[in-house]
């Protein structure tokens, strides 16, 4: 059959049919009858359109070899044979310019004379049966249907055959010729039956003996035999009478399926209230590093030694003072805590041998900041179960917060490139198989795009801090250990650099369960003045601790240096996941890989190299109020990585709930965009489930805002 198709049809038609089948994941060499059917249908569509024009008076005329200078317009726009995206673009354009309703399914042609879409059918069965199937599927009076058969019969909507007798006769003759050619090669019966689905191998295949008994034993309840079950499955229509199926499930279920249209969805309601505040475990875009290059000091690699060396690079220390107090805290204690850290670091330097770790003195300011002796005493339930009014500890509802612009700025900054490399190319052995070669090529390209990304810096910073804190929590349970916040990178010139962001002081950490909390005080350097966005720093007490000279285009300028101090807490399970933040690199690489795979399957070759090296091509990155944002493949890699990193940094029950529930609405909207006629019940219930997760979390609120932008542009 494949040879016949390639001999019988124009090469352009054969190529289009192959492309169409590949787009749907079908193989022309295997599904040869389908290959022949698609070629036949394409040829009929082209013949339907051939020689039909509209002259300058708007009249329909037939021109087979006329004056090339005549002002003629093709009567039919051919939609069949284009790839799906381009076909829908053509359909949308026609609808916008002519005002006709957009069809739910892709039609084959548009008739500019009659101003209507046309669906062409070619059948090996009775024309009226096929016509009814088409009409039931399309469910539109706007689209004209015209069916041809291989026996010379035809059927059209309202018996309106559109074309003149001679044009239709040409199509019927061609179909009859194809049928005769197939019959002479012994291909016709197989081709005819493949549409009707007559005797298939499965129906002739008898299951006997043990397999038959196993099949009968494996039936779902209420089915007496395999035939009984098969008949039910064959007659089952998955989209039919959902209401009826729901009512069979439970007497309480009473759902009416409502059609989901472009006008159905509303935007998510974001909460009102004061702007949301920063809640990450460490500073992100506002962090400041004290750095040493090519470290070679004694004890290099020991955090405390590295930290002291970094501190010595800065000479602008000043007497600290509070410039943005924490509203609920005892702010002088935060000031005293920083002074204590400075004093104890000075003490270390005065010693003959610097210790590897430093445990802070248990001063009143640190005991207050770390919540020492503040936890309510735990009492065994057995000792108090007889108390009449025993009740759970009452906690207030969280205060609603509104979206603030700082979180979008944080995200934008996380997508940017820094001047340092934060990850090395993994040293993995030689590739031994072709698939390994492709995998390492993809990994290398991806690493090159993200190694300098600020989100990658956040990963390495998060891994370091969580590892150090978990180690200290286990090794020094009763001590207030001082933990430097350190990261390592390479400069553009390839020199090693060690960075100090600040310090953590860990509280008591007898962590028995995964969720037991260890308190810590973080003290982080910054050049950001907290008075510019005070709402962002609600949970912080900010000190001014020095002046830093910065090189700018106009020379050196002096800027105040701040210390952001806050009490925070984490648990074993959170630290365990924090230590594994490198997984974010893997997740975003897999997302990029699925994009490469989709491209490669269409082109039938590995597209990794073209994907990363074609710098002129842009890709969709995300939605914004302006529309779909596009960027280079590197920008896509960095954006996907930043999203994954922020999901880790801002992980919360609100994010889990929002992601799970909003995904359902996203799938419904996607089905509508794919013209699948989705139906819903209790849509307001779904909105309620999504919106109850919009409370005060900055990352969730930003995602909800992005979701609203997506809804606006997806349903235009």
From Swiss-Prot:
Q: Where in the cell is it found?
A: Host cytoplasm; Host nucleus
User: Which organism is this protein's natural source?
Assistant: Influenza A virus (strain A/Hong Kong/156/1997 H5N1 genotype Gs/Gd)
- In its UniProt entry, what is this protein called? Polymerase acidic protein
Cofactor info, note text:
Binds 2 manganese ions per subunit.
Q: Which family does it belong to?
A: Belongs to the influenza viruses PA family.
Annotated GO molecular function terms are: endonuclease activity; metal ion binding; RNA binding
Q: What is its EC number?
A: 3.1.-.-
The record's listing under Gene3D superfamilies reads: Influenza RNA-dependent RNA polymerase subunit PA, endonuclease domain (3.40.91.90)
Can you name a GO cellular component term?
A: host cell cytoplasm
Give the location of motif Nuclear localization signal 2 (NLS2) in residue numbers. Answer: 184-247
Main location per the UniProt record: host cell
What gene name is listed for this protein? PA
């Amino acid at each position: 059959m494949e040879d016949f198709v390639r001999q019988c049809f124009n090469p352009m038609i054969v190529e289009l049919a192959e492309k169409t089948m590949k787009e749907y994941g079908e193989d022309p060499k295997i599904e040869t009858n389908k290959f022949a059917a698609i070629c036949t249908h394409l040829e009929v569509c082209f013949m339907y359109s051939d020689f039909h024009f509209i002259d300058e008076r708007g009249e329909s005329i037939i021109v087979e070899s006329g004056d090339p200078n005549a002002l003629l317009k093709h009567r039919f726009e051919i939609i069949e044979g284009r790839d799906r995206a381009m076909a829908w673009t053509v359909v949308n354009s026609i609808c916008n310019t002519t005002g006709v309703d957009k069809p739910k399914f892709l039609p084959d042609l548009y008739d500019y004379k009659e101003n209507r879409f046309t669906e062409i059918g070619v059948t090996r069965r009775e024309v009226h049966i096929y016509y009814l199937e088409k009409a039931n599927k399309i469910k539109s009076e706007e689209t004209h249907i015209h069916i041809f058969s291989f026996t010379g019969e035809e059927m059209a909507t309202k018996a309106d055959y559109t074309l003149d007798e001679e044009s239709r006769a040409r199509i019927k003759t061609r179909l009859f010729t194809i049928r005769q050619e197939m019959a002479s090669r012994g291909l016709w019966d197989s081709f005819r039956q493949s549409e009707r689905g007559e005797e298939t191998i499965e129906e002739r295949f008898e299951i006997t003996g043990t397999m038959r008994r196993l099949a009968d034993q494996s039936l779902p309840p209420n089915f007496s035999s395999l035939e009984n079950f098969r008949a039910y499955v064959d007659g089952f229509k998955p989209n039919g009478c959902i209401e009826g199926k729901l009512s069979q499930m439970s007497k309480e279920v009473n759902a009416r399926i409502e059609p989901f249209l472009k006008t159905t969805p509303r935007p998510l309601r974001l909460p009102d209230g004061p702007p949301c505040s920063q809640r990450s475990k460490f500073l992100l875009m506002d962090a400041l590093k004290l750095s040493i290059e090519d470290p070679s000091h004694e004890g290099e690699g020991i955090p405390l030694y590295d930290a002291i060396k970094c501190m010595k690079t800065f000479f602008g220390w000043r007497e600290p003072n509070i410039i943005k107090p924490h509203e609920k805290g005892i702010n002088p204690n935060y000031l005293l805590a920083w002074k204590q850290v400075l004093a104890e670091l000075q003490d270390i330097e005065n010693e003959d041998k610097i210790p590897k770790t430093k445990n802070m003195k248990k001063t009143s300011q640190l005991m207050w900041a770390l919540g020492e002796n503040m936890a309510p005493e735990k009492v065994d339930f057995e000792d108090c179960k007889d108390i009449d009014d025993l009740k759970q500890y009452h906690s207030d509802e969280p205060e609603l917060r509104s979206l603030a612009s700082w979180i979008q700025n944080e995200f934008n900054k996380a997508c940017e490139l820094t001047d340092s490399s934060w990850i090395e190319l993994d040293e993995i052995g030689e590739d031994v198989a072709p698939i390994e070669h492709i995998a390492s090529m993809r990994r290398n390209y991806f690493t090159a795009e993200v190694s300098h990304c600020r989100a990658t810096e956040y990963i390495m910073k998060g891994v370091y801090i969580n590892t150090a804190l978990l180690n200290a929590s286990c090794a020094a349970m009763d001590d207030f250990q001082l933990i430097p916040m350190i990261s390592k990178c390479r400069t553009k010139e390839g020199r090693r650099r060690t960075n100090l962001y600040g310090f953590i002081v860990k509280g008591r950490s007898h962590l028995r369960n995964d969720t037991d909390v260890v308190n810590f005080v973080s003290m982080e350097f910054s050049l950001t003045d907290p008075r510019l966005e005070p709402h962002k720093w609600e949970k912080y007490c900010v000190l001014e601790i020095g002046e830093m000279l910065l090189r700018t285009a106009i020379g050196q300028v002096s800027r105040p240096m701040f210390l952001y101090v806050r009490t925070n807490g984490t648990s074993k399970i959170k630290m365990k996941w924090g230590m594994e933040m490198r997984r974010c690199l893997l997740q975003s690489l897999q997302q990029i890989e699925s994009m490469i795979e989709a491209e490669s399957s269409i082109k039938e070759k590995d597209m990794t190299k073209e994907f990363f090296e074609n710098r002129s091509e842009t890709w969709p990155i995300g939605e914004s109020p302006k529309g779909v944002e596009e960027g280079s493949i590197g920008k896509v890699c960095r954006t996907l990585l930043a999203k994954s990193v922020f999901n880790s940094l801002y992980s919360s029950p609100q994010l889990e709930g929002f992601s799970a529930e909003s995904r359902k609405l996203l799938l419904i909207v996607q089905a509508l965009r794919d013209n699948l006629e989705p139906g819903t019940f209790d849509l307001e219930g779904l909105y309620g489930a999504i919106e109850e997760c919009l409370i005060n979390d900055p990352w969730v609120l930003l995602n909800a805002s992005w979701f609203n932008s997506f809804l606006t542009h997806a349903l235009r």
